[in-house]
Structure formats: C-alpha cells, structure tokens
Amino acid sequence: VDVKWVNEQGESERGFGAVQKLREAQNAWEGYLDQEALTKVIQENARINATPEGQSKNPKKSDIAVGWKQGFDPIRELINRSYGAGFRSYDYYTADAVSVISEETFYGNRIKHVKNWLNDKNDVGYSLYSEKEKEYIIDQYEALDAPFYFDYHDGWYQLLENLGFIPMLGILILGFVMAGIFSNEFKWKADAVYFSTLHGRTKATSTKIKAGLLLVTVVYWTAMLIYSFFTLGYLGFEGAGCVVQLRVWKSLYNITMWQAWILAMFCGYIGNLFLAALTM
C-alpha cells in the first residue's frame, strides 16, 4: 500500500510525504467533470506537452513533465478511454491528440463504444451476450449519472484493488484450522465414542459447526477492518462518494467507492463462510 510521487527533479518519492503531495495536487482539481473542467484538463495537458520537458526525449526530463500531470492524471486517463478507437482499445497518448473536448461527447463515447462492441458481428461482444443481457448492459451504461465528481480517491482505489488478497489468505489459513474440527475424532480414533453419545450427532456437532463459523466471522471481519482502516488512514478517506468509473471506466455497476467496498467485504465473507462449511 503506497503511492509514487514524481518531484520537480523527475525523481520518484514514496512514503507518507508522497501521499500528502499527491493528495494536494489532485485536490486542486476537485469538482464535477463538466465542460469547464474537461477543457481545463486538455489545455493544461497541452501546455505541459509544449514545454521543453514535455517534448524532450530524455527520460529524466520527460519524467518531470509526467510529474506535472499528476494532479489531473486520473482525468486524463478517462479521456484516453473515452476518445479511444473502440471499447477494447487503449492508447496512453490519446489525450495528447485531443485539442477540443465536449462534455456530451466525453460521456457519450462510453455508451457509444459499448453499443458498437455489443452489436458488431465481427467482435466478441456480439456473440458473448444474449439480447437481454446486451439490453441490460446498455441500460446500465445509460443510467450512470453525469457529470462525474472528481476528488482525491487513491485510498479507496488501492483498498479496492488489494481487498481480495486478505480473503484469499484467510481461506488458506482457516482451511487448515477448519479441517481439524471433525477429522480429529477419526485421527484420534474417538469417532465411535463421540458420535454414539447422547448429543454426539446433534448438539455437539451443531456446536462445533457454530464455533467454526464464529471463528471465521471473527477472524475475517477483524482482519478486513484492520486492513481497510490502515489503508484509508495512510492514504486518505477522501473520495468515498466518487463513482467507481473514475478508475474502472467500463464498469456497468453504478456504485460509489464506499458501496463497492461494502459489496466486496460481504462477498468475501460469504465466500469464506462457504469454504469453511465445505472444509468442515
């Protein structure tokens, strides 16, 4: 969990100081991505490209120019996606070729690209989905509110990017723990005694299952909440209300960063419970 900041000398900085600098740079661009904001990004991008550093072939000087764009870089990436050649195409330098931008076209391209991809018989999207599924995807794209609100959101973005690691690690560790809950009776050759007792097949078994699920619940939520608050405490809580499309342009889920976090947390929990039950 960390960010990189390119300073005025073209050198990379990391650590909490880099986080603070990136937050400050991106907060300067906070606001709705309307016509005025998009035009400002295009103009600033063109101004930087016209500098000696922006035109230099020297990697060090070129990095200085890249550093100047860090404040609006996520917005520039959206322009790359919107004005790309198609739904599945990407070119880092697309935004550099855009001299005039339209708010309507910027958001409209997202819908146009997915429609073309789904209806082009020569593309994989045409045969990948049924007509009802295509209609649903397009409806979801059209239902997304615009303009987007931009704010520093690196904490939430990195949290969502890495959130799947903890459940996978938890499944691995808890799998070993859960595996012994019932198998130990057979290992110790006590199963005949255990299951022949008055409550061996009922209350005792039920208690073991409940204890196993409780263990999964406590370990999972403790680990996930600690990781989440550590990440957000270090990188920042700002940007919770930003839509996920600020970083995942093609997403058909019209939810915010914090809603995606809640969804990911519960999906991971259900997955852990299922695998724990399966292991037991």
Enumerate the predicted regions with their spans.
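Membrane-proximal extracellular/periplasmic loop immediately following the first transmembrane helix
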Residues: D2-W117
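Secretory targeting signals
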Residues: D2-W29, F106-E185, S206-T279
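Hydrophobic transmembrane alpha-helix segments characteristic of membrane transport
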Residues: W188-A192
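Long, hydrophobic, well-ordered secondary-structure blocks that form the structural core
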Residues: V193-Y194, T217
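Generic transmembrane alpha-helix motif of multi-pass integral membrane proteins
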Residues: Y194-F195, L278-M280
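Short helix-to-coil transition segments within interhelical loops
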Residues: F195-R201
